[in-house]
Amino acid sequence: MLFSTVLSHRTLYILTCPNTLIHSYTHPHIHAYLAFTGFLTQLHHLEISCLLLLFFSLSSLLKLMADPDCIFRNGYVDYYNYSFNYATSLSRIYNSHDSFYYPHQTTNPNINENPNLTSPDSPPLREALPLLSLSPIHKHQEPTANHHEYYFMETTETSSNSNFLDQCQDSYRHDVTVDLHLGLPNLGDGGSSSSDVVLDSTDHQEGHHDHHQDQGLEVTMASDHDDEHGGLQRGNHLHHFWIPTPSQILMGPTQFSCPLCFKTFNRYNNMQMHMWGHGSQYRKGPESLRGTQPTAMLKLPCYCCAPGCKNNIDHPRARPLKDFRTLQTHYKRKHGVRPFACRRCGKAFAVKGDWRTHEKNCGKLWYCSCGSDFKHKRSLKDHVKAFGNGHVPCCGIDHEEEEAASDVEQQE
């Protein structure tokens, strides 16, 4: 009480008097107060800040030890309420003592002169702790969404890769379709079921040597339960067949090339015999005739590609031909150009052998003992065989002429 009274009456005098007047004043409370304020002024501002920060840190730690759940009660840390704003505290201290005398300074130290202590720091943003949050449902749902998002992205990426692989496979199948024309041709609305197929592994290995020669060939397979195609109904197993194009039929499916001089041959054996002329080293090993592999494609049954032909696969009673060579002869005779003409009667032929046989026998008549005449020897023989006794060939048909019978008559 006495201290406050003396301070209230003597404040202005004490603040303005010199040191000699202050020291000459002998009141014990005034001396104690002045000693405390002198001690504070002698301390550095940073030391005071450290002491105050340590004090309030200890107080916060004690409060945390008393109630450890207070920090995470709301899912976040309240930095603003539990932090010590030492700048505000220092400003209050200096503002309350700004009228005291400082022996080491000529001006009153104002807190505003320090740029670091001009204004209190803004409170930090409130953010949830990811590991100590008390809302596990929300935190559990978010990874689930991310999981679904990742699964969707992975599914999309997998689908895009699968689409890419499908496109690669489709392009590969397209190439194979262009080269080999896999699958049955379109049978229309009335067509029966069929399945696409490739050659067996054995046939594929046998024809691997002729891979380049067999490009562009069409390989198909149909089931034998096809009632509309009578030639296919031979059991419950599947048969391979081949539908060559007209260019393949006319020019041949194989062109074997010599690796040394690049001369081409229609037959593999002819090419091997040609290579013997290049040296004796080609008579042994894989280059010799011992290792010749037959062309598997040439042994397959073939359908004619000409529309309307009875050997066409679209024909209701279609039958495949024996092999490719038979198909070549059939196509030339029935659907090909006929460049050979008889010099006697002018009849045209597509096969050279048929033309030579016809020209040799052109204009001749074949007679029977009964008086019947025939243009073809085959017809006379059929006549004699049919009527038997009393019917014999006349004009002395020799064996050489019998062997030179026309192949056309045999096919017809």
Swiss-Prot record:
The gene is WIP4. The lineage of its organism: Eukaryota, Viridiplantae, Streptophyta, Embryophyta, Tracheophyta. It is found in: Nucleus. SUPFAM superfamilies: beta-beta-alpha zinc fingers. Belongs to the WIP C2H2-type zinc-finger protein family. Its main location: nucleus. GO terms for cellular component: nucleus. A zinc finger (C2H2-type) spans 256-278, 303-335, 340-362, 366-391. This is Zinc finger protein WIP4. Probable transcriptional regulator.
